[in-house]
């Protein structure tokens, strides 16, 4: 299988896992949904978990690149960019194929913290927190690490609530809470 076919497999597997879950999608179903035989899948991925890790790496890259681009397009000032995170989330929540966060799902299906799937999910959240810390430092806000952690908590809570039932208002509600946190960090 060529690199482009492998990449296509990872992209199609990402879609299957995102919509169907990790444990619920067996290799037979995955082969059917991706159009790739199990033999071909196993020629590139020793185990299903290896394929899952590849999809999570791809999703991490896609999501963080998308978020940074959207935030930078929505606001220029670092303080405003912290708030623009929630505007970007509102756009994501409005997409018809929104199915929550792949990393929240992965960590809930692989709860053992030492499992590589759980670890890559935790790393994704750490990288987002680092991005928020960087913005808070650029904005010269007080206790930037604490603020970044709080912004991350609001973001993650908004994702869960948007998934459960409240897509229309949850991002703006989280943004209002973030405004209070940022105002406090400014004073």
Predicted regions and their residues:
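N-terminal intrinsically disordered/low-complexity leader segments
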Residues: 1-4, 186-187
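Amphipathic alpha-helical segments used for helix-helix packing
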Residues: 95-116
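Hydrophobic alpha-helical connector segments
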Residues: 54, 68-95, 138, 148-151
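Short, basic, alpha-helical segments at the C-terminal edge of helix-turn-helix-like DNA-binding modules
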Residues: 57-64
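C-terminal peripheral helix-coil segments that are non-catalytic and often amphipathic
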Residues: 126-142, 164-187
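Amphipathic alpha-helical packing segments from all-alpha helical-bundle domains
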Residues: 61, 80, 113-138, 149, ...
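Hydrophobic alpha-helical segments that form the core
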Residues: 143-161, 177-180
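Helix-turn-helix
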Residues: 8, 12-50, 54
């Amino acid at each position: 299988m060529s690199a482009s076919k492998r990449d296509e497999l990872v992209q199609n597997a990402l879609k299957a896992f995102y919509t169907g879950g990790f444990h619920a999608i067996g290799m037979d179903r995955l082969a059917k949904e991706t159009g790739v035989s199990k033999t071909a899948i196993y020629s590139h991925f020793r185990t299903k978990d290896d394929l899952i890790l590849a999809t999570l790496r791809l999703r991490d890259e896609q999501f963080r690149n998308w978020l940074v681009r959207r935030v930078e397009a929505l606001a220029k000032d670092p303080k405003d960019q912290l708030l623009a995170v929630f505007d970007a989330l509102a756009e994501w929540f409005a997409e018809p194929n929104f199915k929550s966060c792949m990393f929240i799902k992965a960590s809930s299906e692989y709860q053992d913290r030492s499992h590589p799937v759980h670890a890559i999910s935790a790393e994704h959240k750490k990288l987002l927190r680092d991005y928020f810390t960087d913005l808070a430092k650029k904005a010269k806000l007080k206790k930037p690490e604490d603020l970044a952690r709080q912004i991350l908590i609001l973001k993650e809570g908004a994702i869960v609530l948007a998934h459960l039932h409240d897509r229309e208002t949850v991002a703006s509600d989280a943004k209002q809470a973030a405004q209070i946190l940022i105002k406090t960090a400014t004073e």
